[in-house]
């Protein structure tokens, strides 16, 4: 076997459709575009969503949902599982977490969420707690201060 003897598998190469080359070619005359109308003409068709002059659906439907919140509450978020490396009876604040490298950016007041497990007792001072986080901190013997 040589490179000069190689050829593609039979049926793997499909011939390009040549339109407008006479009726006998199978795609002559109207070239597969039907008879008359906008879709048979040259050039691009209509834009997406165009309904022939009728008021399109995206303009008939009312604009109701997905308003942006004007004054969103942005929190610096930390999960309970991230606090397990801290020593017991430590006072946890946003400043202490930034000093420890657990939190890198100050996106607003601290909020503690309940993902993960906590085994050490900590005194956590934050702006907000989720219900699960509060339960896990108190179950480990710690306290929550808002």
Curated annotation (Swiss-Prot):
What's one GO BP annotation on this UniProt entry?
translation
Ranges of Gly residues composition bias in the record: 23-35
Q: Which domain of life is it from?
A: Bacteria
- What does the entry list under GO cellular component? cytosolic large ribosomal subunit
Keywords attached to this Swiss-Prot or TrEMBL record, sorted alphabetically, are: Ribonucleoprotein, Ribosomal protein, RNA-binding, rRNA-binding
Q: Where is region (Disordered) located? A: 1-52
Any GO MF annotation of the entry: structural constituent of ribosome
**Self-association and partners:** Part of the 50S ribosomal subunit.
Cited function: Binds to the 23S rRNA.
Write out the similarity annotation.
Belongs to the universal ribosomal protein uL15 family.
**Name used for this protein in its record:** Large ribosomal subunit protein uL15
Name the species this protein comes from: Picosynechococcus sp. (strain ATCC 27264 / PCC 7002 / PR-6) (Agmenellum quadruplicatum)
- What does UniProt list as this organism's lineage? Bacteria, Bacillati, Cyanobacteriota, Cyanophyceae, Oscillatoriophycideae
Gene name of the record = rplO
């Amino acid at each position: 076997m040589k490179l000069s003897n190689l050829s593609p598998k039979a049926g793997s190469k499909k011939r390009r459709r040549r339109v407008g080359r006479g009726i006998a070619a199978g795609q002559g005359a109207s070239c597969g575009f039907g008879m008359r109308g906008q879709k048979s003409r040259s050039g691009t068709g209509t834009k997406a969503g165009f309904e022939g002059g009728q008021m399109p659906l995206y303009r008939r439907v009312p604009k109701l949902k997905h308003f942006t919140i004007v004054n969103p509450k942005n929190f610096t978020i930390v999960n309970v599982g991230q606090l397990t490396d801290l020593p017991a009876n430590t006072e946890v604040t946003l400043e202490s977490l930034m000093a420890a490298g657990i939190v890198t950016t100050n996106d607003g007041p601290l909020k503690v969420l309940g993902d993960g497990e906590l085994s050490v007792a900590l005194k956590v001072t934050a702006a907000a707690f989720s219900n699960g986080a509060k339960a896990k901190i108190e179950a480990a013997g710690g306290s929550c201060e808002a």
